[in-house]
Amino acid sequence: YFKLPESYKKDTSKYSNLLKNNPRLIPWFPAVLIGKDYNAAVKILEEVKPQRIVSNNTGIAYKAYTMGIEWIAGPFLNTTNSYALRTMKETLNCAGAFLSNEINQMQIRKIHRPENFKLLYSIYHPILMMTSRQCFFQQTVGCNKPSIDDRCMQTCKKSTTITNIKGVSFNIDKQRGGYPSIYNHEQFLNMQIVSDLANLLDEFFIDLTDIGTGSKEKLDKAQLIKQFERLLQGELEPEFQLHEMIVESTNQQYIQGL
């Protein structure tokens, strides 16, 4: 997958050319696309005409539907039940969906998918808590600008960690072309679902983007991929290895459910 930004310069050709030159990459559209940035994302879709996309934005999903492009409902659409799957399939010809990470094993088992519909699940990713158009760095690490402008959106790349009065830490992260976001200090890591529900799910997904880590040491992505591949092959040792590599992680949402 190739994750597209939330904000674009006037020229979107570099993204269009990248996707055209690498047709194996599946465009991944973000949830927040406002005004001209939404129009830019539509332009990329029209220029590239990919076979398949992942969209966390229903506007892009509708555009893909009208163009006859296969689309998958992204994890930020937070799909939790059979009715949502059926609605997306019948109204927008959705080809599949990431199931919500907030539902537990029993709730997932009760979901009935439409015919010819894929079910996907993210087993490793940063836990996003909030995205805002407000700058979070002015009152933390400091910034001279009074508010976010177009230049900030395109060039600013910062991350830091804050701790509240209860001693709980949160990670603030700003990517180039993205809005400032706050993440849980723990990564979501659910290896249990691989043995629980592998027969019900078509694809497992891991998010290796460097977000939500604050000032922590970056993980070896090649080693992470290797261990996850071994996990999916049914080996037991990778569970121990992954917990050793990803020190701060949780799957409490999967255990508790809605």
Regions found by a protein language model. Give the residues of each.
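Active-site pocket-lining/capping segments in soluble small-molecule metabolic enzymes
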Residues: Y1-L258
